[in-house]
Swiss-Prot record:
Gene: MCF2L2
Region feature Disordered, mapped onto this chain: 530-614, 962-1114
InterPro entries: CRAL-TRIO_dom, CRAL-TRIO_dom_sf, DBL_dom_sf, DH_dom, PH-like_dom_sf, PH_domain, RhoGEF_Guanine_NuclExch_SF, SOS1_NGEF_PH
Species name: Homo sapiens
CDD domains: RhoGEF, SEC14, SPEC
Residue ranges occupied by any DH domain in the UniProt entry: 619-822
This protein's name: Probable guanine nucleotide exchange factor MCF2L2
Length: 1114
């Protein structure tokens, strides 16, 4: 690029010429001897206590006159000094060097004024004094005092300047010619002080403007001369237009300045122009000379800048011509760079025959695609050579471009030749490896098909041995190279990965051959023991268990070598069989299976032994074991998403399957799933493994990682956006390819909901540990041994382990609640940013709401008002009302919420209503002017909400009372006949529902607490899975429910509007009519909204869907 190339024309010439102009302006205006300007002392000059009339003495000395001024002695010293300094700096240096003649007119003044004038002149006159003429005071007494004073002080003034006392102007004319004196002194010199001040001010302003303009042109020229040349034609055109506009602006200023100077010069010469007989005084002549010299400097400034601009404009035009080459060069280089980048993406030699063949096809396409860019690049290099030969100013910049183009072309052509050779070798390399792998897989499947129960007879053994011998004979059909020959032929291709793969394949060949040998030995031994009865111990291969790693599974008597198949009930299974780690496990497990095959008659059934060992474990250790096993499966599932969906997005041969919207939003689709994987794989799993032998560390593990687990909140905060992207892109071919490659039966988004299910699993396991503590941590009441199992053992109150478990459970439940809140609030539009200040979300659900304003309506008119349907959220410190809208989506109508208002609890009161309102309660503002009547779907929901709000209000009231400043009141219905009775009753009922599992499950549906756990849940590992499904169905909604979470329950549909209008009052009327019809439907037994009672380990909110509830009850 030419961005680093500076314009070659130096600005020294322009800078030098303009600097000369500035210096000349300073000399003309005598800037060195005139520190002040007229505009700075304009007020002092207008007072006219001293003037420079323009008169001269006989020897040309300038005359400064001090006219009669009554307040002369009151003039500040600074003002006097400034005026004297300015007046003495105006005459030329030659005239000032002669000396100034001072004429002091004090004919009407006193001796004191004469003395003050002489004293100030003697002390503060900045110029060279030649003579002082004093016109004596005309009155006799003052003249006498003046004569005496002059005689007395003459010696003092004599040493500094000659003083001549004159009695009248006629005496003064004997010393100074009348033509050099103003009319006040009896002369004929025309002097107008206001005009003189205006001329001086205008001349100085003109000189200052000229100087400033010259400096501005200097700066502008430097900027233009040092500016970097642009990199494109459009940029060059823009730069040229910009510079031209700036130049035109400066040129206009120069022209305007020239007109101003010409006008000022005309004004100064006006007296002589109007009256040819009149002559200009010396001051006026000096002003004319000054303006003429300044105009000459202005003309010089214009010439210097015009010359510079012509060269700069020519340079920009040449640059614009250069940009044609630069533009073509950029396009050609970009095309070559893209070709080289695509070529560089083929650095891999392929990891399979299909991959290599695909690379060869793409490489051929790339070669065909490169023909046109190569021709253009070579032609452009020839154009560059022509520019160099034409002595272009940027020849040094063009020459490297031509060289670069030719080098890029040569690099690409040579790289293609080298690629063809390497890929040809790689294709043969992988074909050889595939031959070995195919033979090994065929052998493995042969071994897997030889079931144990078929080898119980001599005939079955002979058939198996014959099959093995036949298969080993087929090795002649595969011209396999020896390892030494293999490495010698493909030595250049053996990178670390290729070498590792070759070693694995060849090692697998050795392992399979060894397995065949052992199988033959085993079958021969088994044939010799046919007299002993053999009990079959393994099913057929088609019903054998799925492949699991030897780290997490017990040895089996079968040989599960086939690729595992997933079912919809098992979202967490092993991923691929083609990884090297699993191939090693496969061969090792095969060897181990031979030993089991050989000795299974001499020991009992291993599955029964495994069950016996599990039966020996305590419930606590079984739960820890379940936690570890599911944790490993969870990590592997996340890893499969990363390796199977995220990583392949960068594969060039799959890019055509990925739509742009998915490519641009892949980070939002997967969120921070990599962060989840790193945390669980590197940190959390290792800490959980330490709990296998010491379960007491489990709770501490969760508490220790409380902050790290907040990554789940970040994940779920992004989940709604991920769902939207998935719904838009779920049908693209890329997901289908990845799903088939991973052998997943479920789509991707089912696995993306795995973190949500994992949090539920943690919650259930922690609840299970609380219900199944070891005997040393329990106290069993002997009288309860015959009771129901659901009552469970009593926990020791001082058990530290139990306390930590409860704290850990609270951490997980709070995390689930915060995650669900993040998703729920994502559906609320126009939600304020400070909603987090209201604290934790406790309850939320749909309600019918009546609004009453006391100053507008009466209670007796209540029946005329129809309810509005609102989604209400109860937080620790406030209530949020949201409007419900049903909007069409991909799966039909779905609810959407819009924020309406927020009410702080500390400003509210609550009361129950009278008879006939068993589903309603009222909340009101503290002043009672604004009231809301809320109708729930059932009495149980009403009681739960009323109890929870009452509890929060009482807590806040107690806190305020402790501070001595109550801020709210609570009232009860007059019809109830009790003061706080309904509060206490509802609170007791809510407390009972939390503590009694039977009453909880049979009472308020949707309140998530620990009653859904029972001792029967954790009798075995399968029970934990059943409990997870049950808890998920009963406790979670929206975020944690199944993939059809966009569907809503029937009760919720009854609350939602079918089509809201945004037309003001009509919208509300339609909404209320719909709500009235919906209210009738709710009485049929609609399910509740999401409820989450607060407590020490408060659960998260839940939506109790009717189908799932019935399933749980069954």
């Amino acid at each position: 690029m030419l961005s680093c190339l500076k314009e070659e024309m130096p600005p020294q010439e322009l800078t030098r010429r303009l600097a000369t102009v500035i210096t000349h302006v300073d000399e003309i205006m005598q800037q060195e001897v005139r520190p002040l300007m007229a505009v700075e002392i304009i007020e002092q000059l207008h007072r006219q206590f001293a003037i420079l009339s323009g008169g001269r003495g006989e020897d040309g000395a300038p005359i400064i006159t001090f006219p009669e001024f009554s307040g002369f002695k009151h003039i500040p010293d600074e003002d006097f000094l400034n005026v004297m300094t300015y007046l003495t700096s105006i005459p030329s240096v030659e005239a000032a060097s002669i000396g100034f003649i001072v004429v002091i007119d004090r004919r009407r003044d006193k001796w004191s004024s004469v003395k003050a004038s002489l004293t100030r002149i003697a002390v503060a006159f900045p110029g060279n004094l030649q003579l002082i003429f004093i016109l004596r005071p005309s009155r006799f007494i003052q003249r006498t005092f003046t004569d005496i004073g002059i005689k007395y002080y003459r010696n003092e003034f004599k040493t500094k300047v000659p003083i001549i006392m004159v009695n009248s102007v006629s005496d003064l004319h004997g010393y100074i010619d009348k033509s050099q004196l103003t009319r006040e002194l009896g002369g004929t010199l025309e002097y107008r002080h206001g005009q003189w001040v205006n001329h001086r001010t205008a001349i100085e302003n003109f000189a200052l403007t000229l100087k400033t303009t010259a400096q501005m042109l200097q700066t502008f020229g430097s900027c233009l001369a040092t500016a970097e040349l642009p990199r494109s034609m459009l940029s060059t055109e823009d730069l040229l237009m910009s510079h031209t506009r700036q130049r035109d602006k400066l040129q206009d200023e120069l022209k305007l300045l020239g007109k101003q100077g010409t006008t000022l010069l005309s004004c100064i010469q006006e007296p002589a122009t109007k009256c040819p007989n009149s002559k200009l005084n010396l001051n006026q002549l000096e002003n004319v000379t000054t303006m003429e010299r300044l105009l000459v400097q202005l003309d010089e400034t214009e010439k210097a800048f015009s010359h510079f601009w012509s060269e700069h404009h020519l340079k920009l035009n040449q640059c614009l011509q250069l940009q044609h080459f630069e533009h073509d060069f950029c396009k050609a280089k970009l095309a070559l760079d893209n070709l080289l980048e695509e070529q560089a993406e083929f650095t891999g030699i392929g990891d399979s025959v299909m991959h290599v063949e695909q690379i060869l096809k793409e490489h051929k396409k790339l070669e065909e695609k490169s023909q046109e860019p190569l021709e253009k690049a070579q032609l452009l290099a020839l154009v560059g050579d022509q520019l160099i030969q034409s002595h272009h100013y940027a020849a040094d910049a063009i020459r490297p471009r031509c060289v670069e183009l030719r080098h890029l072309c040569d690099d690409f052509i040579n790289g293609n030749k080298k690629k063809w050779d390497i890929l040809g070798k790689s294709l043969e390399f992988h074909r050889q490896l595939d031959k070995v792998s195919q033979w090994c897989e065929a052998g493995i499947y042969l071994l897997a098909s030889q079931a144990v129960d078929k080898c119980q007879s001599r005939e079955g053994v002979d058939i198996a041995l014959n099959d093995i011998a036949t298969f080993l004979g087929t090795v002649k059909e595969y011209p396999l190279l020896s390892p030494k020959e293999f490495y010698n032929e493909f030595e250049l291709l053996l990178t670390l990965d290729a070498k590792a793969k070759a070693q694995k394949v060849l090692q697998r060949l050795d392992d399979v051959q060894e397995i065949f040998h052992k199988r033959q030995v085993s079958l021969m031994k088994l044939a010799a023991k046919q007299t002993r009865p053999v009990q079959p111990v393994a099913p057929h291969p088609e019903s054998s268990p799925k492949w699991v790693s030897s780290k997490t599974s017990q040895p089996s008597t079968s040989v599960p070598l086939a690729r595992p198949l997933r079912t919809s009930e098992e979202p967490y299974t092993e991923t691929e069989l083609n990884s090297r780690g699993k191939e090693d496990d496969e061969t090792k497990f095969e060897v181990k299976s031979e030993e089991i095959f050989e000795s299974h008659h001499e020991r009992g059934n291993p599955e029964l032994e495994q069950q016996a060992r599990l039966g020996d474990l305590s419930p606590r250790r079984r739960i820890i074991r379940d936690l570890l096993e599911t944790e490993e499966i969870y990590i592997k599932e996340i890893k499969s998403i990363i390796d199977g969906y995220i990583t392949p997005m960068d594969f060039i041969w799959l890019k055509h399957l990925i739509p742009d919207v998915l490519q641009n939003n892949k980070d939002f689709l997967f969120g921070n799933i990599r962060e989840l994987y790193e945390f669980h794989n590197r940190t959390f799993l290792k800490e959980l493994e330490k709990c296998a032998e010491n379960p007491e560390l489990l709770a501490h593990c969760f508490l220790k990682r409380k902050e790290d687990l907040q990554i789940y909140f970040k994940y779920h905060k992004n989940l709604p956006r991920a769902r939207a992207i998935w719904q838009e892109c779920q049908d693209c071919a890329y997901f289908g390819v990845c799903q088939r490659q991973l052998d997943h039966n479920l789509p991707l988004f089912k696995y993306l909901k795995g973190p949500s299910q994992r949090l539920i699993k943690y919650q259930m396991l922690l609840k299970g540990l609380l219900d199944f503590e070891s005997p040393e941590d329990m106290e069993i009441d002997p009288g309860e041994l015959g009771g129901s199992a659901k009552d469970g053992p009593k926990r020791t109150k001082d058990s530290a382990f139990s306390t930590e478990l409860q704290q850990a459970l609270a951490v997980i439940e709070d995390l689930i609640k915060s995650c669900e809140l993040a998703v729920d609030l994502a559906a609320v539009t126009e939600c304020p940013d400070d909603i987090g200040k209201l604290g934790k979300l406790l309850l939320h659900g749909p309600f019918s709401v009546w609004t009453i304003h006391k100053d507008r309506y009466k209670m007796k008119d209540l029946i005329r008002f129809k309810p509005s349907q609102r989604q209400i959220y109860l937080f620790e410190r406030g209530i949020v009302f949201c409007k419900i809208r049903m909007e069409p989506g991909d799966q039909g109508l779905s609810p959407h919420y819009s924020f309406k208002k927020t009410m702080k609890l500390m400003t509210l009161s609550i009361r129950q209503l009278g008879r006939g309102s068993h589903r309603k309660f009222e909340i009101a503002s503290r002043n009672g002017l604004e009231k809301y009547i809320l109708q729930a779907a059932s009495k149980e929901i009403r009681d739960c909400w009323f109890s929870e709000i009452s509890k929060l209000l009482m807590e806040q009231q107690n806190n305020i009372k402790d501070q001595g400043n109550p801020q709210f009141e609570m009232s009860t219905s007059k019809g109830s006949g009790a003061g706080s009775g309904p509060w206490i009753k509802n609170m007791e009922r809510a407390t009972t529902s939390k503590e009694d599992p039977a009453s909880s499950t049979g009472g308020i549906k949707g309140c998530s607490s620990r009653e859904f756990s029972s001792m029967d849940t954790f009798e075995d590992c399968e029970g934990a899975e059943d409990m997870e499904k049950e808890s998920s169905a009963l406790s979670l909604a929206g975020l944690f429910q199944s993939d059809d979470s966009h569907e809503t329950c029937s009760s919720k549909s009854a609350f939602l509007e079918r089509g809201e209008s945004s037309q003001g009052e009509k919208e509300e009327r339609d909404e209320e009519e719909t709500a009235t019809r919906s209210t009738e439907e709710e009485r049929a037994g609609a399910s509740t909204g999401r409820l989450a009672p607060a407590g020490a380990t408060a659960g998260f909110q839940a939506r109790a869907l009717r189908p799932r509830t019935s399933a749980q009850e069954s």
